[in-house]
Amino acid sequence: MKVMIIAPYIYDDNIIEFTKNKTGFGIMVQNIVSSVAELENVVLLTRVITKGKNEKNFKILSHTWGQFFSNAKLKDWLIGIKAFFANGVTVKDKARHVFYEVDGGYVRKQIQKEKPDIVHIHGIGTITESYIRICEEMKVRYTVTLHGLIGLNDSVSAPAYEKQIERDFLIKAEKNNIPISVISSGMKARIEEKYLGKKANNITVITNGTKKSDENDTKFIREEGTLTQEKFQEYYSDCLKQNDLYPKLSDTYAYLQYSKKNGKKILFFVGNITKNKNQMQAVEILKNTKVFENILLVLWGREVDNGEVRKKIAEYQLHKNVILGGFNDRMDIFWKFCDVNLFLSLNDGFGLPIVEGYMHGVPCVTFEDLDATQDLYYPEAMLKVKDRSNESVTDTLKIALDKNWKYEEIIEIGNMFSIDKIGRASCRERVFWVVV
């Protein structure tokens, strides 16, 4: 079966044009593409301008400005012009929406050329609307995967029109039996309750997965004593004074190695730093240094919060307890330092960092009411926080740090969510919809 996977972008550190968007979504889609390509004939189409590339098992289709202009039809331009004059949109967004709609001509041409059995679209919004439009125009079978919900989450920063697109499409999809997959049971339940008011037979839960790298850490190991605790803390204090400046990964690695050796308990919190990911609450909790004197928290991810968390770390003088680590594409060699994976997101479809931690034997503390918790909760690997107060998080975290976790059991749970298993489930779902 030939599958055309369509996504706004992926993250791949080996291809320069795919390194701009350093997000969990980009990593997840790249993992899914690689996994499905082990089983099916896969081509990948994105919004990114690229010359394309033949990867080991799949092909990234070229997407150049020449292809953009030469394949656009009059109707694509007319729809683009209509999008430009939409209400409540900034000029920058207007230009972006015109690009998305006019780019429909390129998408049409690629579908004609590649002749996929099914098109698999990732995400709902203005950035993917023209993908759906072209599939329906050409009467090509398509399925859509949602990696999160924006319309039901006040903490997710998105324009009202984007949230309305999500709502309208999910209602349309249920009415027309368009196959949808979501990444957690909690997401499906909320769609049924808040959008549809009934059970949705067209929605399937296929949890996301991840893969564990065999990468070694040889290049990160340095001679003992070359970066003392005092030197790192002084160096990190200087980093805190400048926006988007982080310690080198090799220096953070050395400091974590030193801290672990000297009895520190280490927490990781993985995800771009945003209001929704809620790293600020973790910082507020660590402010109580009497309780967490021997704790080191590392926040891994890009800052998308205008430096608010950075300012709080400086204000509370927590440079000895909270490290802004920046985006880390070598996480696999860092997990061994982590005692507990802290995940305090306000809303999250799946909680990929939870699974990444599991695969390395790292237990998690997270909120009971997250969409992700229903599928990822195993008492051998997770403690659930009953409510969102700082006191409840503090109490649960203290229990987690004192608990005698069985790391091999946690790894076994993590292996249940390997990207290969998820890829096979995804392929079975596509085959079903193609046959139907």
For each feature predicted by the language model, list its residue ranges.
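N-terminal subdomain of nucleotide-sugar transferases
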Residues: M1-K53, K59
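Membrane-proximal helix-turn-helix segments that form the acceptor-binding/catalytic region
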Residues: N31-I32, I150, A160-I180
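A short, active-site helix/loop in glycosyltransferases that binds the activated sugar's phosphate group
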Residues: T50, K172-D244
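Conserved donor-binding/catalytic core segment of Leloir-type glycosyltransferases
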Residues: S181, R222-K277, L286
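Glycosyltransferase donor-sugar binding loop
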Residues: T210, V270-T274, I295-R310
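Nucleotide-activated donor-binding/catalytic signature segment of Leloir-type glycosyltransferases, i.e.
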Residues: V309-N328
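Aromatic "clamp/platform" in nucleotide-sugar-dependent glycosyltransferases that forms part
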Residues: L346
